[in-house]
UniProtKB/Swiss-Prot annotation:
GO biological process: maturation of SSU-rRNA
Name of the protein: Ribosome-binding factor A
Classification via SUPFAM superfamilies: Ribosome-binding factor A, RbfA
Organism of provenance: Chromohalobacter salexigens (strain ATCC BAA-138 / DSM 3043 / CIP 106854 / NCIMB 13768 / 1H11)
Gene3D superfamilies named in the record: 3.30.300.20
Protein family per UniProt: Belongs to the RbfA family.
Gene Ontology molecular-function annotations: ribosomal small subunit binding
GO cellular component, one term: cytosol
Matches recorded under InterPro entries: KH_dom-like_a/b, RbfA, RbfA_dom_sf, Ribosome-bd_factorA_CS
Recorded coiled-coil stretches: none
Amino acid sequence: MREFKRTDRVADQLQQELAVLIQREIKDPRLGMVTVSSVKVSRDLGYADIYITLLGENDAARIDENLKVLRHARGFLRSQIANRIKLRHVPELRFHYDESVVRGQRLSSLIDEAVADDRRRHEDDDEDEVR
């Protein structure tokens, strides 16, 4: 069995190309600092789900606005990809907001809170034993 599947290689290549294209070629002022966090390509290479994050922005309205800009530019992006990557058929691009980063930050803050609470309890217990 092969080490890497073709869909994985295509997804990696799409991620690299889209990251460059979004930053350099889309001139829409509504577009924020978009990062392509991952790309998943269907087995038949018919479509690609592109997951993005926005640097420093978690507002739902801004996220929707950025997704709207990217969805509007998907034809342009697809044609640019066709010029850069040798594929018989360039997958249809479907953009999604990647909530895993936000969830990860939330989990991290919950862990930090739990550790701080535990330390406070430990300090309170130590003070009670001293008395």
